């Protein structure tokens, strides 16, 4: 091993170790969750909050954003899109924002987007929080990612941490600049491990709508074994670092060459062709739509004041589902629990930048391995313009409501 590579591996493993949450982190996050529940109890009837995202998967740092799903008495994920239910949820989120501000949360704002969210900074920990109503998919995929990480926490953890650190430094992960979010790039990184035989392919989803379930993933992971050589990597950061570095090289090489115009990123079917993804989505939405209609009809039968069923509302609700699963966007990265295209928000104008960064990473990690410098690979860039929408300018947008302590 050349000197530059050895120093690079030391640097990346030190970076990973320094990013790990302290032993008491689970207590800190639990207390944060309790504070959010206290707010929820004031805002909705019989509130329940559930954490999801990186603090559940384990692919986090102490200061990672906290994603939280809020539900309430008689909540049903099937009714989103029904005008009266959406209006009530809007009132619930507005009350939640007011109560969050009153209880000491900072920079509180309610964004009434396709997926409404209340954002704030926790006054105790400084952790940024995103609270949405009934994010069932987010909760499920976080549990699956957690199960994946548990196979070998340091191996998967170091690899994903370094991919994300690179992505954030190089504006490949920057949703506020219309590039990827962390979950999307994590999925991309995991598909490379599947191609290397270092993670099973979740090819037999058994969900009611053709989706992968937590039980599906856990069953397959229980049977999965990494190659025997990986047993020697425990408690040896030099050997572990070499294995992680190899995977980083393959990640860079893979996506520098990958034909995104034809293929999708999928943990259910790696390199699935877009036309196949279209068929899968079509069938998924057929099943989803049938169940959704049944739930709407049931709700209206029990709540005459909300009826009759508005076909325009129902069509708009299903169109919203379709909009989240386009097959013609520059990138198609499948969310494995509901087939949402997580890469859909990347604008065509960002494709060149992203491809340049994959090429740069491949060149530095492979072509110029003997000249490796950790600081240069992870050097922060600031070349991609920020998205000037509600996430960029806040109070200028009518969809954003800010709250200040009374």
Swiss-Prot record:
Keywords, sorted A to Z: Magnesium, Metal-binding, Mitochondrion, mRNA processing, Nucleotide-binding, Nucleotidyltransferase, Transferase, Transit peptide
Q: Which residues bind Mg(2+)?
A: 65, 67
Co-factor(s): Mg(2+)
Record's catalysed reaction(s) = RNA(n) + UTP = RNA(n)-3'-uridine ribonucleotide + diphosphate
Q: What happens when the gene is disrupted?
A: RNAi-mediated knockdown in the procyclic form causes growth arrest. Moderately increases the abundance of mitochondrial RNAs without causing defects in RNA editing.
Tell me the compartments it is located in: Mitochondrion matrix
List the EC numbers from the record: 2.7.7.52
SUPFAM superfamilies given in the database record: Nucleotidyltransferase, PAP/OAS1 substrate-binding domain
What effect is documented for mutating residue 141 to A? Partial loss of catalytic activity
Q: Where does UTP bind?
A: 54, 64-65, 138-142, 164, 168, 181-183
Targeting presequence: 1-15
Q: Name one GO biological process term.
A: RNA 3'-end processing
Q: Name one GO molecular function term.
A: nucleotide binding
- What is the free-text note on the cofactor? Binds 1 Mg(2+) per subunit.
List the GO cellular component terms: mitochondrial matrix; mitochondrion
Q: What is the effect of changing residue 181 to A/D?
A: Complete loss of catalytic activity
Give the matching Pfam families: MTPAP-like_central (PF22600)
According to the record, mutating residue 345 to A results in: Complete loss of catalytic activity
Q: Report if keyword Transferase is assigned.
A: yes
The record's listing under Gene3D superfamilies reads:
1.10.1410.10, Beta Polymerase, domain 2
PANTHER family the UniProt entry points to = MITOCHONDRIAL EDITOSOME-LIKE COMPLEX ASSOCIATED TUTASE (PTHR12271:SF97), POLY A POLYMERASE CID PAP -RELATED (PTHR12271)
Its annotated function is as follows: Terminal uridylyltransferase which, as part of the mitochondrial RNA editing core-like complex (RECC-like), is involved in the post-transcriptional editing of mitochondrial RNA, a process involving the addition and deletion of uridine (U) nucleotides in the pre-mRNA. Specifically, catalyzes the addition of U to single-stranded RNA with a preference for a 3'-terminal U and adds the number of Us specified by a guide RNA (gRNA) to precleaved double-stranded RNA editing substrates. Essential for insect and bloodstream developmental forms viability.
Q: How does it assemble?
A: Component of the mitochondrial RNA editing core complex-like (RECC-like), also known as the editosome-like complex; only a small proportion of MEAT1 associates with the complex. Interacts with RNA-editing ligase REL1.
The record's comment on protein family reads: Belongs to the DNA polymerase type-B-like family.
Q: Would you tell me the protein name for this molecule?
A: Terminal uridylyltransferase 7
Taxonomy, top ranks, is: Eukaryota, Discoba, Euglenozoa, Kinetoplastea, Metakinetoplastina
* Name of the gene this protein is made from: MEAT1
